[in-house]
From Swiss-Prot:
Gene3D superfamilies: Lactate dehydrogenase/glycoside hydrolase, family 4, C-terminal, NAD(P)-binding Rossmann-like Domain. It comes from Rickettsia bellii (strain OSU 85-389). Its EC number is 1.1.1.37. It catalyses: (S)-malate + NAD(+) = oxaloacetate + NADH + H(+). This is Malate dehydrogenase. Keywords: NAD, Oxidoreductase, Tricarboxylic acid cycle. Belongs to the LDH/MDH superfamily. MDH type 3 family. HAMAP family: Malate_dehydrog_3 (MF_00487). PANTHER family: L-2-HYDROXYCARBOXYLATE DEHYDROGENASE (NAD(P)(+)) (PTHR43128), L-LACTATE DEHYDROGENASE (PTHR43128:SF16). NAD(+) binds at residues 11-16, 35, 97, 120-122. GO terms for molecular function: L-lactate dehydrogenase activity; L-malate dehydrogenase (NAD+) activity.
């Protein structure tokens, strides 16, 4: 990857602005901040660059309303679309955001066909599928931000439960980025010790872990209900930057993301949250975990929900 990659952010709302801030603090590359609303990306770009003078970052940020400015991008993160409001599920956004995603995909195809694309817009698993099909980009270069965020929430709740640092917790959340996601306690650990073993030691109970799993599934909804006028943006932005960094720096991290499946986990031609290796080629490998019968059934149920939503937009 070249010394100063070009990173385009499509959508300059709360997540888009936070992405620009985090990317510039990490000096990952120069940024194009795009939005259809005049003045918003330009104002945020100016504000963030002025903040960067205090952080020692010389990253350049261009605010724009012209898609041509994304030309030649090395990586693109898409947040454009309506956010959730209290009482809404991610799936309620499907009609409006599908139209927006198709428009974005056309411009990505036109101006940045070699970019690595991360989709954040909800309903995530459908939007990333629309991006793949409409843009014509290779599937290893189009992924969705889901599992990194869901796992970070699961990690946080588990760290609270066991009263340990979040750095000691590692977890995996599979499936669609929705209410039927599958947090896997069996594959989640505290300093290498699986959660079921910690339960056997008397450090928690199965009932408490199930409550944590339910809270993880509703993690986004909990924040929407508290904010009342928007949805989460700090953690989603941080999650996408983790994925971006692994690609730009060829870190080959194992991260749970919405990836295009071609038979893995018994699923074909769909996106679902699974562990993948992200390196300089995008998705380097899909890691197929051995699931129990019950875990596979939960995963299948989650994926079936995604499949039905995709049929609705075809």
């Amino acid at each position: 990857m070249k010394k100063n990659p070009k990173i385009s952010l499509i959508g300059s709302g709360n997540i888009g602005g936070m992405l620009a801030h985090l990317i510039s603090l990490k000096n990952l590359g120069d940024i194009v901040l795009f939005d259809v609303a005049e003045g918003i990306p330009q104002g945020k770009a100016l504000d963030i660059m002025q903040a960067n003078t205090l952080a020692g970052s010389d990253i350049k940020i261009k605010g724009t309303n012209d898609y041509k400015d994304i030309e030649g991008s090395d990586a693109i993160i898409i947040t454009a679309g309506l956010p959730r409001k209290p009482g809404m599920s991610r799936d309620d956004l499907i009609s409006v955001n599908t139209g927006i995603m198709k428009s974005v995909a056309e411009n990505v195809k036109k101006y940045a066909p070699n970019a690595f694309v991360i989709v954040i817009t909800n309903p995530l698993d459908v939007m990333v599928y629309v991006m793949l099909k409409e843009s014509g980009l290779p599937h290893n270069k189009v992924i969705g931000m889901a599992g990194v965020l869901d796992s970070s929430r699961f990690n946080f709740f588990l760290a609270e439960e066991f009263k340990v640092s979040t750095n000691s917790v590692s977890s995996i959340v599979l499936g669609g980025h929705g209410d039927a996601m599958v947090p896997l306690a069996r594959y989640s650990t505290v300093k290498g010790v699986p959660i079921p073993d910690l339960v056997k030691m008397g450090l928690s109970t199965n009932e408490r872990i199930e409550k944590i799993i339910d809270r993880t599934r509703n993690g986004g909804g909990e924040i929407v209900a508290l904010l009342k006028t928007g949805s989460a943006y700090y953690a989603p932005a941080a999650s996408a930057v983790e994925m971006l960094e692994s690609y730009l720096q060829d870190k080959r991290q194992i991260l749970t993301c919405a990836a295009y499946l071609q038979g893995e986990y018994g699923v074909k031609d769909l996106y679902a949250g699974v562990p993948i290796i992200i390196g300089k080629n995008g998705v380097e490998k899909v890691i197929e975990l051995q699931l129990t019968t019950n875990e596979q059934a939960l995963f299948d149920k989650s994926v079936d929900g995604v499949r039905k939503l995709i049929e609705a937009v075809k």
